[in-house]
Regions:
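Hydrophobic h-region of N-terminal signal peptides that target proteins for export
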Residues: 9-17
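Acidic, small-residue rich beta-repeat scaffolds with periodic aromatic anchors
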Residues: 16-98, 198-285
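A short beta-strand motif characteristic of beta-propeller blades
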Residues: 76-80, 127-134, 181-185
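Acidic/hydrophobic-patterned starts of short beta strands in beta-sheet-rich repeat architectures
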Residues: 97-105, 148-159, 199-203
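Short, solvent-exposed loop/turn segments at conserved positions within beta-propeller repeat blades
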Residues: 109-113, 164-169, 209-212
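Beta-propeller blade repeat segments, especially FG-GAP/WD-type strand-to-loop junctions
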Residues: 118-122, 166-185, 216-221
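Repeated scaffold domains used in trafficking and secretory/extracellular systems
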Residues: 137-143, 187-194, 237-239
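Calcium-coordinating acidic loop motifs
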Residues: 146-148, 282
């Protein structure tokens, strides 16, 4: 009887005196679960990327076996992985993208993640120029054009991220690949519209309508200079606009008030998104 009372007393003390300990234990357990999930996610991503790299090696062998000095396209399914791992689709496109040199663009995709690589084919030697990995249902595509008006073709990977609140057409722009040795680096642009004859880029930033900016950049060789930003004027609830050189640094001395958007912005892709606001969108500003 005495032992039962003592045991009950210990249990009561434990319940009354350890809410902080219980909270800490709960937090530790929660952190452990999160960490385990992150480890599984990281491990799965690494496995997926390694499998895509294996498929890329197979694609290079296909090119070595089948490319005979002329434009060539080929699409096939790589071997299926274990369990429920999906087929990997391989898309190969070999062309003279730049002058007289053949390049190969290869996509390896498991329908969730995509690995993209660009190779220069020089006397049967495959030189890797770029390699980009796109996770989580991001579907990239490529385009070739003169972005900065220097009469030299540029290469771009375009994609729309699978997460985020607002319009976000992303360009990875690789300037003048034919003029550069080794791996290429890119300039990242969001919602751009290119005006190569003017050596300009006009576009829309990232954010909600009414709070997102228009921008204008000028090419200086392969560098970009910021010329101006335009934002809806909060004071007039978007009926007029403010123009300045600094996005968040407008001052009364430097800002220019506009009663309407300049005509030069009317051809910006997605302009309707920039203008898709009402007076209510400024009520909390």
């Amino acid at each position: 009887m005495r032992y039962s009372c003592f045991l009950s007393f210990l249990m009561l003390i434990g319940c009354l005196s350890s809410p902080k300990q219980q909270e800490e234990s709960s937090q530790i357990a929660s952190d452990t679960v999160v960490e385990a999930k992150e480890q599984r996610y990281f491990s799965k991503n690494v496995k997926n990327e390694l499998l895509l790299q294996k498929a890329m090696v197979d694609a290079l062998q296909k090119i070595a076996d089948s490319f005979h000095g002329e434009d060539w396209e080929y699409t096939y399914d790589f071997e299926k992985g274990e369990g429920d791992t999906p087929h990997i689709r391989i898309d190969i496109n070999v062309q003279k993208y730049f002058k007289e040199t053949y390049y190969a663009v290869i996509y390896a995709s498991d329908y969730v993640n995509t690995l993209v690589r660009l190779y220069r084919i020089d006397h049967d030697v495959m030189q890797e120029k770029l390699s980009e990995y796109f996770p989580w249902m991001t579907v990239p595509s490529d385009t070739i054009f003169d972005a900065n008006g220097d009469k030299v073709k540029d290469f771009a990977l375009t994609f729309y991220p699978s997460s985020g609140c607002c319009r976000r057409d992303i360009y990875y722009l690789y300037l003048s690949p034919e003029k550069k040795e080794g791996q290429l680096s890119y300039i990242e642009l969001i919602n751009p519209t290119f005006y190569p004859k003017e050596h300009l880029i006009r576009g829309i930033g990232y954010g909600w309508p009414g709070h997102v900016e228009l921008y204008k950049y000028r090419w200086r060789g392969e560098e970009l200079d910021t010329l101006e930003y335009i934002l809806p004027d909060v004071a007039t609830k978007g009926k007029t606009f403010l123009k300045g050189r600094n996005l968040y640094g407008f001052t009364k001395e430097k800002e220019i008030r506009l009663t309407k958007l300049p005509e030069e912005y009317q051809t910006v892709i997605g302009l309707e998104y920039f203008l898709d606001y009402t007076e209510e969108d400024f009520n909390n500003d």
